[in-house]
């Protein structure tokens, strides 16, 4: 499926892992992207408060969630977790969002930025930056109705 380049807007990108969520954001014209410190995931989703603070601080208007599909484009266990978290976040934040196939983004960030054996979350945030750059180039446009499903099981 080919998407059109999305309209410029300030967006938060999330690389969702089981322990941490890598974060990156772009300016309203989608010219520059920056990483933010990765946030730890909590059982009761306390990290949403931190994410909300970043959205308010940088006046972000939507978000994208990386979905790690397998090499055949099929859903993985982690992809299902990411998809569900994206739905939860959209419902909590009331913001439009989209999913982006992030197959191999961690490997790419490790190679591109020379990060090995990272436990700080830096590689997660650089992966979020790669996901964001991919979204800026390829889309898809954010769903204007928060919470609408875009990837089928």
Curated annotation (Swiss-Prot):
Class of this enzyme: hydrolase
SUPFAM superfamilies: Ribonuclease H-like (SSF53098)
Pfam families linked: RuvX (PF03652)
Main location: cytoplasm
GO function terms (MF aspect): nuclease activity
EC number, UniProt record: 3.1.-.-
CDD domains: YqgF (cd16964)
Localization annotation: Cytoplasm
Cellular component GO terms held in the UniProt record: cytosol
BP terms from Gene Ontology: rRNA 5'-end processing
Keywords: Cytoplasm, Hydrolase, Nuclease, Ribosome biogenesis
Keyword set includes Cytoplasm: yes
InterPro entries associated with the record: RNaseH-like_sf, YqgF, YqgF/RNaseH-like_dom, YqgF/RNaseH-like_dom_sf
Coiled coil: none
Entry's family note: Belongs to the YqgF nuclease family.
NCBIfam families: RNAse_H_YqgF (TIGR00250)
Function as written in the Swiss-Prot or TrEMBL entry: Could be a nuclease involved in processing of the 5'-end of pre-16S rRNA.
PANTHER family named in the record: POLYNUCLEOTIDYL TRANSFERASE, RIBONUCLEASE H-LIKE SUPERFAMILY PROTEIN
Name this polypeptide is given: Putative pre-16S rRNA nuclease
């Amino acid at each position: 499926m080919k998407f059109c380049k999305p309209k410029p807007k300030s967006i938060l990108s999330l690389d969702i892992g089981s322990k941490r969520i890598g974060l990156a954001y772009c300016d309203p014209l989608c010219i520059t992207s920056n990483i933010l410190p990765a946030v730890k995931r909590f059982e009761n989703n306390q990290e949403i408060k931190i994410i909300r603070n970043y959205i308010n601080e940088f006046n972000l208007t939507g978000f994208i969630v990386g979905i790690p599909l397998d090499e055949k484009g099929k859903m993985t266990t982690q992809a299902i977790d990411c998809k569900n978290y994206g739905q939860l976040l959209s419902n909590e934040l009331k913001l439009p969002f989209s999913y982006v196939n992030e197959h191999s983004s961690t490997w790419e960030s490790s190679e591109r930025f020379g990060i090995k054996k990272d436990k700080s979350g830096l590689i997660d945030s650089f992966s979020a930056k790669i996901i964001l750059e991919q979204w800026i180039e390829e889309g898809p446009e954010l769903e204007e109705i928060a919470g609408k499903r875009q990837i089928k099981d």
